[in-house]
Amino acid sequence: MIIKNNDGESTISGKAITLPTPMIFPPPLFIRFIQYKTDGKLWSNENFEINSGKVECNGEDYELVQSRCITQKIDDDSENVMDIRIMPSRPLNRDLPYFN
């Protein structure tokens, strides 16, 4: 996933699954990354704004709109895990498929 904001561009990659989301509008996007690698300044923050970005899934790009992002690192002895909650200001152009 690539995220851009006033602090620059940041990326996260690894095994990921989408998580169930509440039925609110616009629909949020919940993603769990497992065994992830990050690049950029954003990932040390628990809350930040997204200007734009994209999620790459199964060879396809899903554009992110201006959003609020909340991250949570989960302490696990065996794997590094990060949950990412993206709250978009408007609906995404395409729904990200549920995947695992």
Curated annotation (Swiss-Prot):
GO BP annotation list? cell adhesion
Query: Where does the source fall among the domains of life?
Result: Eukaryota
Which family does the record claim for this protein? Answer: Belongs to the csb family.
What protein name applies here?
Answer: Uncharacterized protein csb family protein DDB_G0272596/DDB_G0273963
Please give the organism. Answer: Dictyostelium discoideum
